[in-house]
Amino acid sequence: MKTLLLTLVVVTIVCLDLGYTMTCYNQQSSEAKTTTTCSGGVSSCYKETWYDGRGTRIERGCGCPRAKKGIERICCGTDKCNN
């Protein structure tokens, strides 16, 4: 009986994927690729693109912040989807 209960607990944890954390790219513009592990139950990544006097600027990170005027924002929901 204990073995069956333990098996059910393990299967539940595996199926629910408890403790899953999202991984997103967080490099800016043309920097080398780096990633970050998102905290606080964040389940999305973002990529923002805009233009200034220096050319195209890109920012990446966790979450899905509100885009300001003139900024193109893409949000996605899988690991490293904001490349």
Curated annotation (Swiss-Prot):
One of its GO terms (molecular function) is toxin activity. Expressed by the venom gland. Gene3D superfamilies: CD59 (2.10.60.10). Keywords: Acetylcholine receptor inhibiting toxin, Disulfide bond, Ion channel impairing toxin, Neurotoxin, Postsynaptic neurotoxin, Secreted, Signal, Toxin. It is found in: Secreted. InterPro entries: Snake_3FTx, Snake_toxin-like_sf, Snake_toxin_con_site, Toxin_cobra-type. Pfam families: Toxin_cobra-type. GO terms for cellular component: extracellular region. The keyword Disulfide bond applies. Residues 1-21 form the signal peptide. Disulfide bonds join 24-45, 38-62, 64-75, 76-81. Its main location: secreted. Belongs to the three-finger toxin family. Short-chain subfamily. Type I alpha-neurotoxin sub-subfamily. Binds to muscle nicotinic acetylcholine receptor (nAChR) and inhibit acetylcholine from binding to the receptor, thereby impairing neuromuscular transmission. This is Short neurotoxin 3FTx-Oxy4. It comes from Oxyuranus microlepidotus.
